[in-house]
């Protein structure tokens, strides 16, 4: 199904949140909702959305590390935490599918891997 009007507002808030972050690539699964969530950020940064499979998270993590790009990866409640964990070498599970305000930032440098979790205020107007 498409994003709700609230989901559209959140996707635009995500784009604004990342406005000052120059991204190299935007990844999303092939689901309509994740594509629609990624679209405002990709458009604002002049990027096309690259697809990835949730069935190959280890490969995705390896690709992200190998390419060393600043990337936005839009995923799902049962895969996003897992992918973040793979990137930093920690076991992180899924989160409740009703949570829409969580942004994981993974910072990988030569000697360190860090995970920051932002609990954003991506609330909907009129709620």
Q: Where are these predicted regions, by residue range?
A:
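Active-site-proximal alpha-helix that buttresses catalytic centers in soluble enzyme cores
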Residues: 1-68, 80-87, 91-127
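Residue-level preference for the first positions of well-ordered beta-strands
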Residues: 70-74
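Active-site metal-binding loops of divalent metal-dependent hydrolases
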Residues: 77
């Amino acid at each position: 199904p498409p994003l709700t009007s609230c989901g559209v507002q959140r996707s635009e808030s995500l784009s604004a949140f990342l406005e000052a972050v120059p991204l190299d690539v935007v990844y999303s699964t092939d689901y309509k909702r994740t594509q629609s969530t990624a679209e405002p950020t990709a458009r604002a940064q002049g990027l096309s959305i690259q697809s990835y499979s949730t069935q190959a998270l280890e490969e995705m993590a390896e690709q992200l590390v190998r390419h060393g790009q600043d990337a936005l990866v839009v995923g799902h409640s049962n895969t996003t935490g897992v992918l973040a964990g793979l990137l930093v070498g920690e076991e992180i599970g899924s989160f409740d599918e009703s949570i829409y305000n969580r942004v994981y930032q993974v910072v990988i440098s030569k000697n360190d891997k860090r995970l920051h979790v932002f609990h954003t205020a991506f609330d909907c107007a009129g709620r």
